[in-house]
């Protein structure tokens, strides 16, 4: 018996592993209405996900296929749950998850502490008390060791001034301090108290002035002088160019070769930034400038089903 055209298309799509999410309507209209014989042909045709047990005469699922489908079906559910949460709780849980994962996820703590408003970061710390019966600062201090601890505790403890006044002389002085620290210590600049003080106490507008003065003093870009893999670089780019930061991690999450962890960044960025129209518009503009297509086009191209529709709905909130 020949495989129906609809199931043949579905087989090709699943075998290719293209996109994220699941086209629920296609599954309902094809698999849901298919005959038993058709589903057997479907299993035989999908060799990437099914293997034939010749001794027992049936086609069994590869374990990785089961995990793959569970993950793809869960993307929409995860996004909805995260969107329904209070933003403070959402950020508190993100920080807790990062601490559980360890050093490879500490950049998420930097993201939360450096891209949120002073009130939202304070709210996340309050939520942390309620959820985990300890302070965020205390938990970070007990889990993180070495020079990273001082920076991370300082960043999450910050309550930055958000007014429009800047003492330019002070920003220039801080730029000189940072220039000397980066020149003499490189990545180890994060160990210097003055560097931590500047990054954890100064307003974001002050840091923008510092950035301008640093580039004039050094004749080179501050962000290019620090290793891109370091927490110091993560903090700088989140504080100075958040739209660039989010655009890059969105693009990484939409890459066909992205790993499971990286693909999850997509949901995180959308649900945490969608309520902030100005920020989301800056991200959309930066993404378009960097990659030559709109974020909406990329989502339409790469994502499937209800997950795609939900992301596009969140994206349209800032239109």
Curated annotation (Swiss-Prot):
Protein task: May be involved in osmotic stress and abscisic acid signaling in a calcium-dependent manner.
Note on domains (UniProt): A pair of annexin repeats may form one binding site for calcium and phospholipid.
A single MF term (Gene Ontology): mRNA binding
Null allele phenotype: Plants are hypersensitive to osmotic stress and abscisic acid (ABA) during germination and early seedling growth.
Positions of modified residues (Phosphotyrosine): 159, 211, 287
Annexin repeats: 1-75, 86-157, 169-240, 241-316
Any single Pfam family the record assigns to this protein: Annexin
Positions of post-translational Phosphoserine modification: 277
Residue positions where Phosphothreonine is found in the record: 115
Protein name as annotated: Annexin D4
Any one of the GO BP annotations: response to abscisic acid
GO cellular component terms attached to this protein's record: Golgi apparatus; plasmodesma
Family: Belongs to the annexin (TC 1.A.31.1) family.
Keywords per UniProt: Annexin, Calcium, Calcium/phospholipid-binding, Metal-binding, Phosphoprotein, Repeat, Stress response
Gene name per UniProt: ANN4
Tissue-specificity statement: Expressed mainly in roots and flowers. Lower in stems and leaves.
Species assigned in the record: Arabidopsis thaliana
UniProt KW Disulfide bond keyword: no
InterPro entries found in the cross-reference section: Annexin, Annexin_repeat, Annexin_sf
Domain of life: Eukaryota
Residues binding Ca(2+): 19, 21, 72
Induction remarks: Up-regulated by salt, osmotic and oxidative stresses. Up-regulated by abscisic acid (ABA) and salicylic acid (SA). Down-regulated by heat shock and dehydration stresses.
């Amino acid at each position: 018996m020949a495989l129906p055209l609809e199931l043949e298309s579905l087989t090709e799509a699943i075998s290719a592993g293209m996109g994220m999410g699941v086209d629920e309507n296609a599954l309902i209209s094809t698999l849901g209405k298919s005959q038993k014989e058709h589903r057997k042909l479907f299993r035989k045709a999908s060799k990437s996900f099914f293997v034939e047990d010749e001794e027992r005469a049936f086609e069994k699922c590869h374990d990785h296929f089961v995990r793959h489908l569970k993950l793809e079906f869960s993307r929409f559910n995860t996004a909805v749950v995260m969107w329904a949460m209070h933003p403070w709780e959402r950020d508190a849980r993100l920080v807790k998850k990062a601490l559980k994962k360890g050093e490879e996820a500490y950049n998420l703590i930097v993201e939360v502490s450096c891209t949120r408003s002073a009130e939202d970061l304070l709210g996340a710390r309050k939520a942390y008390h309620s959820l985990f019966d300890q302070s965020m600062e205390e938990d970070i201090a007990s889990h993180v060791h070495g020079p990273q601890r001082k920076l991370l505790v300082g960043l999450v403890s910050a309550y930055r001034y958000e007014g429009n006044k800047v003492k330019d002389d002070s920003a220039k002085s801080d730029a000189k301090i940072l220039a000397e620290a980066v020149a003499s210590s490189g990545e180890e600049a994060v160990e210097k108290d003055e560097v931590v003080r500047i990054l954890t106490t100064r307003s974001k507008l002050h840091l923008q002035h510092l950035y301008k003065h640093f580039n004039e003093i050094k004749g080179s870009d501050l962000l290019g002088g620090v290793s891109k893999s370091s927490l110091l670089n993560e903090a700088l780019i989140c504080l100075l160019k958040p739209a660039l930061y989010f655009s890059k991690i969105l693009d990484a999450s939409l890459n066909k070769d992205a790993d499971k962890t990286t693909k999850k960044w997509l949901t995180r960025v959308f649900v945490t930034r969608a309520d902030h129209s100005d920020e989301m518009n800056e991200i959309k503009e930066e993404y378009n400038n960097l990659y030559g297509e709109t974020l909406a086009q990329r989502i339409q191209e790469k994502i499937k089903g209800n997950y795609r529709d939900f992301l596009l709905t969140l994206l349209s909130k800032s239109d």
